[in-house]
Structure formats: structure tokens, C-alpha cells
């Protein structure tokens, strides 16, 4: 479970932790911000890429323009760095 806005109270964490694994992110693309250019969105991610990083992109209409530009370029950068994307194992 990824808490919206990366905000969660200790009580919520305890309750959710009974049924779910909590997953926080390291890097947020801010693709939802229509004031940001697609290139800025890409920089928000690639500037901080590192092994083990968890990156957030959003699958919403609001984020589509930036995500459509930044996601494939982020994946290419990941390959260039010799890193791999994989599912989180629980």
C-alpha cells in the first residue's frame, strides 16, 4: 500500500500493516503538476535515480502529458545505468 501524498499517521500504519505491506517512494516525478514541463518532470526523476529507488508516476489524465514523455526516457536511463526494474517482493 502506498499512502497518498506519502502521508500516514502511526495509527493508520499499524492498522494497514495488519493486512498490507506499506511501500514508500524515494523519487516522485510530479507528473501530475500541469505547470511543470515534461522535461522538468524527467529531471525530477533522473537526477536522483539510484539502485533500489522507488519512483512514482501517476496513471491519471492530469499526469498523462508529462508521464508519456518522462516514463520511457526514465526507463531508457535506467537501462543506460545498468539498473533493472522489478516488482517489489513481499
Where are the model-predicted features located?
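Short beta-strand segments
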Residues: 2, 56, 87-89
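Histidine-centered catalytic micro-motifs
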Residues: 6, 55-59
Amino acid at each position: 500500500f502506498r499512502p497518498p501524498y506519502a502521508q500516514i499517521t502511526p495509527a493508520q500504519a499499524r492498522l494497514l500493516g495488519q493486512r498490507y505491506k506499506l511501500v514508500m517512494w524515494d523519487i516522485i516525478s510530479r507528473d501530475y503538476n500541469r505547470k511543470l514541463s515534461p522535461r522538468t518532470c524527467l529531471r525530477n526523476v533522473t537526477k536522483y535515480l539510484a539502485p533500489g529507488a522507488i519512483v512514482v508516476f501517476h496513471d491519471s489524465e492530469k499526469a498523462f502529458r508529462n508521464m508519456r514523455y518522462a516514463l520511457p526516457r526514465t526507463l531508457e536511463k535506467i537501462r543506460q545505468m545498468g539498473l533493472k526494474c522489478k516488482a517489489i517482493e513481499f
